[in-house]
């Protein structure tokens, strides 16, 4: 909040506002889940995203930050079958529009705004500190013969996820890899320094698009550090609302928050 705004409040209002900001930030940190498929659907005016975990059997109607881990397969540690996109009617019938998408090509595009390009944090310090990755390091998203490489200066580019038919459903996983050099889906050097890697994207289908969502990947760090990175994007990489909006948001999130899973 700009410093010139606070003097217009009484001391009580300032304390209330700061408290609201702290509460909202803490609550927003819970609106992000690791190891969830993205659940894209239409609310009639734009694409919205939730999350679903087959393993945990849980579904969230609203999620904007998703976490995944490299290294789950020791034989192929730098290639994973995430993120996934799944809006099955088995768990979305209570969503707006019954969880369906408009027919068309579901595409993922690099977010051109704040924290859209590939950022990195080495996991040290008292708080997360993300900055663009070193030149040459990229994350690659692959579907079939199509690839989307995202580096520290990438501000555009898109990848087709799936063709959405009249039923409005999708279940598709991308293959994600991390490395440097090469071209397309092949890196000269597969892998990169341990740490947390993240980028932002938007989704589009049938003429509608989403607000930015964020993908936060763990490479060789603890899940506690991964969670700190996820929470950073949940609280820092979104536009700062006014203090009164934060109060409303805090109450709303408190009413609907779910445990991280």
Residue ranges and their predicted role:
Residues 1, 5, 100, 237-239:
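Selective for proline/serine-rich intrinsically disordered segments
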């Amino acid at each position: 909040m700009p410093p010139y705004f606070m003097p217009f409040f009484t001391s009580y209002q300032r304390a209330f506002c700061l408290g609201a900001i702290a509460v909202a930030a803490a609550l927003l940190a819970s609106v992000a889940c690791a190891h969830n498929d993205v659940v894209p659907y239409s609310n009639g005016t734009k694409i919205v995203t939730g999350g679903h975990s087959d393993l945990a059997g849980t579904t969230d109607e609203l999620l904007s930050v998703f976490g995944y881990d490299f290294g789950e397969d020791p034989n192929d540690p730098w290639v994973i079958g995430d993120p996934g996109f799944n809006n099955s009617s088995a768990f979305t019938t209570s969503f707006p529009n019954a969880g369906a998408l408009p027919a068309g090509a579901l595409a993922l595009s690099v977010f051109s705004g704040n924290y859209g390009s590939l950022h990195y944090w080495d996991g040290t310090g008292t708080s997360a500190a993300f900055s663009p990755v070193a030149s040459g390091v990229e994350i690659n998203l692959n579907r079939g013969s199509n690839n989307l490489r995202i580096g520290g200066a990438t501000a555009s580019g898109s990848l087709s996820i799936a063709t959405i038919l009249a039923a409005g459903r999708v279940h598709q996983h991308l293959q994600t890899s991390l490395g440097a050099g090469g071209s397309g889906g092949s890196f000269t050097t597969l892998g990169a320094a341990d740490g947390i890697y993240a980028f932002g994207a938007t989704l589009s289908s049938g003429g509608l698009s989403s607000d930015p969502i964020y993908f936060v990947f763990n490479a060789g760090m603890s899940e506690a550090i991964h969670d700190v990175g996820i929470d950073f994007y949940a609280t820092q990489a979104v536009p700062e609302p006014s203090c009164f909006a934060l109060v409303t948001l805090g109450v709303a999130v408190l009413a609907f928050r779910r445990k991280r899973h």
